[in-house]
């Protein structure tokens, strides 16, 4: 049975329940609360209060999302696009990607080794296949070219 979100307390409780599961951005939390039938003015009031109390933090959400997606093997371009679709500011996204402490070239190499067992492409067709996969994962063509030509290999 779904709770009725007709009071500020109910909206706040639902928002806190969602935040207890994982970090959320303000836009995402607003969308979820609206789907549950909460009035927009109550949503804004509840989220403003949660932000003041430090329970809702865009920077914490960005850090958590970047870390999670990077551990899943996604690159900075894909992560940037996903966060943009979630309504976050481009400048905040770029800052989070710069400050996350992830070596993207190393991350790319790990993804490539897991998928292709460290085998360099033997021909143009295989090179295109590997490049497409890595590009879809969110790595730049420059990084991919460096890796597949052997210039990105330190070990």
Curated annotation (Swiss-Prot):
Record flagged with keyword Cytoplasm: yes
Top-level taxon in the UniProt lineage: Bacteria
Keyword Cytoplasm annotated: yes
Keywords assigned by UniProt, alphabetized: Cytoplasm
Subcellular location: Cytoplasm
A single GO cellular-component term on record: cytoplasm
Pfam families according to UniProt: RecX_HTH1, RecX_HTH2, RecX_HTH3
GO biological process: regulation of DNA repair
InterPro entries xrefs: RecX_HTH_1st, RecX_HTH_2nd, RecX_HTH_3rd, Regulatory_RecX, WH-like_DNA-bd_sf
Function statement: Modulates RecA activity.
Similarity comment text for this entry: Belongs to the RecX family.
Protein name in UniProt: Regulatory protein RecX
UniProt organism field: Pseudomonas fluorescens (strain ATCC BAA-477 / NRRL B-23932 / Pf-5)
Gene that encodes it: recX
